[in-house]
Amino acid sequence: MALADRDGIIVYIAQDNPVAAIDLDLEFEAKAENARLRPKLYKAGRVKGTREIVVRPNYVMIYRITGDVVEVLRVLHAAQQWP
């Protein structure tokens, strides 16, 4: 689901500003890598067992830690309902 979320966001932004879409996609990648390297760096999520990363003021990445694996569950616009 997270990949579909991310793709939808990037495609939408790219319609008006391809450079901004690329920059945001790189930021999504960097935040996901930070979560992989330091899984507890970001705040506890609203759903038990999840954590949340604010990516710019408008986007949130929700992930969970299972053992040594960090799984990004969703990438949402801040205005979207979660959970």
Describe every region a protein language model picked out.
Residues Y59-V60, R64-P83:
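Enriched for short, Lys/Arg-rich terminal
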Residues G8-I9, N34, V60, R74:
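Hydrophobic side chains within alpha-helical segments
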Residues V11-Q15, A35-K40:
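Short arginine-rich
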Residues E29, L37-D68:
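Basic/aromatic recognition patch in beta-strand/loop cores that engages polyanionic ligands
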Residues A20-D23, E27, G49, E71:
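Amphipathic alpha-helical recognition patches that constitute DNA-binding helices
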Residues R6, D25-F28, A32, P39:
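Short amphipathic alpha-helical/adjacent loop interface patches that line ligand
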Residues M1-D23:
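Arg/Lys-rich, positively charged N-terminal/basic patches that mediate binding to nucleic acids
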